[in-house]
């Protein structure tokens, strides 16, 4: 049984690693300190459907938001097993539309290859510092997006996306 669980975890970690790799960085985000915002220069969201995994929620823990990071609470009130990793993406709301916050580093980057199990009834906190990737965020309305797997077995899972909104004052 332990060997099967180890194989399942190895397969999921590989999937998370491949999904967490991103292409080359973009220019610094219009709207970071000292720059102006222009939605024409930004990439619109790819995540039109979020928070569609019934019984699984992600919220921002009160009092943890800063221009450099925050803490999320991820809760599984369903009867399914879930897995999530280190991957996240930030978006900013401009003119009632969501746009990706471009990364501030050049070249390729990735996220730690790890999978966190979120069993039915579990509630976990996940802390992140995005300064290495996005820099310090300017004032505005943002959301953080994380992928989460509805995991049934090796090769048998569905990927969903959770989003939690927050404001930098």
PLM region spans:
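Sec-dependent N-terminal signal peptides
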Residues: 6-13
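Positively charged n-region of N-terminal signal peptides that target proteins for export
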Residues: 1-4
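C-terminal motif of bacterial Sec signal peptides marking the signal peptidase cleavage site
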Residues: 16-20
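Primarily secretory-pathway and cell-envelope proteins
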Residues: 22-105, 119, 147-169
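Short, solvent-exposed, Trp/other aromatic-anchored flexible loops in extracytoplasmic proteins
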Residues: 105-143, 147-152
């Amino acid at each position: 049984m332990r060997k099967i669980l180890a194989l399942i975890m190895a397969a999921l970690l590989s999937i998370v690693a491949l999904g967490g790799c991103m292409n080359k960085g973009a220019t610094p985000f219009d709207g970071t300190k000292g720059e102006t915002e222009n939605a024409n220069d930004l990439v619109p969201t790819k995540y039109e459907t979020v928070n569609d995994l019934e019984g699984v929620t992600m919220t921002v823990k009160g009092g943890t938001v800063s221009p450099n990071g925050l803490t999320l609470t991820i809760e599984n009130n369903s009867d399914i097993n879930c897995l999530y990793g280190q991957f996240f993406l930030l978006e900013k709301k401009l003119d009632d539309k969501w746009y990706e916050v471009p990364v501030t580093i050049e070249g390729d980057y990735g996220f730690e290859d790890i999978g966190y199990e979120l069993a039915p009834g579990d509630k976990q906190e996940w802390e992140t510092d995005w300064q290495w990737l996005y820099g310090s965020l300017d004032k505005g309305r943002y959301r953080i997006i994380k992928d989460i797997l509805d995991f049934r077995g090796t090769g048998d899972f569905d990927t969903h996306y959770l989003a939690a909104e927050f404001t930098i004052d």
